[in-house]
Amino acid sequence: MKNLPIIALDFDSTEAVDQFLDQFNEPLFVKIGMELFYQTGPQLIASIKDRGHDIFLDLKLHDIPNTVGKAMEGLSKLNIDLVNVHAAGGTEMMKQALNGLQKHNPDIKLIAVTQLTSTTETMLHKEQNIQTSIEEAVLNYATLAQSSGLDGIVCSPLEAKLVKNELGNDFLKVTPGIRPKDASSDDQKRITTPEDAKELGSTHIVVGRPITKSENPVASYHKIKESWLG
């Protein structure tokens, strides 16, 4: 699995994806989220793989254990590299997800979403009724994910250092909420730059609009890639 910045393909059609990817002449690591997957279906994955790109299928599965396990068994037949669930579904759900995934392709990495980068501490306390800091809530979910056999988590870069210190370097910390210094934060609340994410312990970063909405996506990608890889 490549250690490149993961480009979030926040589009709603195969045509838009093709138009974007046609600008690049190099292997990429891209993220297919719910919006795109639900609009285009699994066939898009094959066409992106034909271009030589790694794929993070970001569907954030969250249901009863049996349902998630069966769904993940189906997803394991797709040619993807990384997929995720919501850690809030619990350890049994995460274990069933892992079992389902390993039925057809044990090489696919499985990670768990801890807290969305749009979540604030006020939302955590008042809406989720979790009376801890975001850092403690993320670490709790990360610990459950690791104990369930998962490869890592999705978290903000702001929590990556704590997770790294507690759970080790090899446990993946895939971090959205990445913005260059001159970019808008959009709807992300807990954000950092690529350089800071690396320093804080992120193993992979996810970047969307600063690249996909850029006037020059290739140049913006290379700038972020250089900042990330050093």
Curated annotation (Swiss-Prot):
Gene Ontology CC annotations of this record: cytosol
Gene3D superfamilies: Aldolase class I
EC number, as in UniProt: 4.1.1.23
Domain of life: Bacteria
Alphabetized InterPro entries for the sequence: Aldolase_TIM, OMPdecase, OMPdecase_AS, OMPdecase_bac, OMPdeCOase_dom, RibuloseP-bd_barrel
UniProt record, GO biological process: 'de novo' pyrimidine nucleobase biosynthetic process; 'de novo' UMP biosynthetic process
Pathway annotation from the record: Pyrimidine metabolism; UMP biosynthesis via de novo pathway; UMP from orotate: step 2/2
TM segment ranges: none
Keyword match Lyase: yes
Active site: 60
Keywords: Decarboxylase, Lyase, Pyrimidine biosynthesis
Subunit structure: Homodimer.
Family as reported in the entry's similarity comment: Belongs to the OMP decarboxylase family. Type 1 subfamily.
PANTHER family per UniProt: OROTIDINE 5'-PHOSPHATE DECARBOXYLASE
Protein name, entry field: Orotidine 5'-phosphate decarboxylase
Species: Staphylococcus saprophyticus subsp. saprophyticus (strain ATCC 15305 / DSM 20229 / NCIMB 8711 / NCTC 7292 / S-41)
